Regions:
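RNase H-like nuclease fold core
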Residues: 1-39, 50-54
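Active-site beta-loop-alpha junctions of metal-dependent nucleic acid enzymes
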Residues: 34-41, 80, 84
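RNase H catalytic domain
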Residues: 8-13, 46-118, 124
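Short intrinsically disordered terminal tails
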Residues: 1, 123-125
């Protein structure tokens, strides 16, 4: 099943918000605390796996617009800064129990979670 993920913060760095979209439903999180856009994207990817697990899915395609996070999650990044290695390890641990997890890049305009994250009410309060 396809699952879109996106994360952001305002200002950058600032309070992180994430969105996950699948099956016509949207999940938002506003409780991650502070970080930058890269932290937000990684946390959104981890949220996407948590949603998939909660729905009982076993074969997922995770779609995000952060090239850096997609490449790092797929193990294809040439260089991973030390601060992102924990996210990488958490992602690998979170994939346990799934039959198949694929991570793919999509353009921003095609990221349904990104579109959901742009809703103004997400950024209030």
């Amino acid at each position: 099943m396809k699952i879109w993920f996106d994360g952001g913060c305002r200002p950058n760095p600032g309070v992180i918000r994430t969105a996950v979209v699948t099956g016509g439903r949207v999940w938002h999180r506003v409780d991650h605390g502070p970080g930058d856009n890269n932290d937000a994207e990684w946390l959104a990817l981890l949220d996407a796996l948590a949603v998939a697990r909660g729905l009982g899915l076993r074969d997922v395609v995770l779609l995000g617009d952060s090239v850096m996070v997609v490449d790092q999650a797929r193990g294809r990044a040439r260089r991973v800064l030390p601060r992102f290695r924990d996210y990488q390890a958490r992602f690998q641990d979170a994939t346990a129990g799934f039959d198949r997890v694929r991570v793919r890049h999509v353009g921003r305009a095609h990221n349904l979670a990104g579109i959901a994250l742009e809703r103004p009410e997400i950024w209030r309060g």
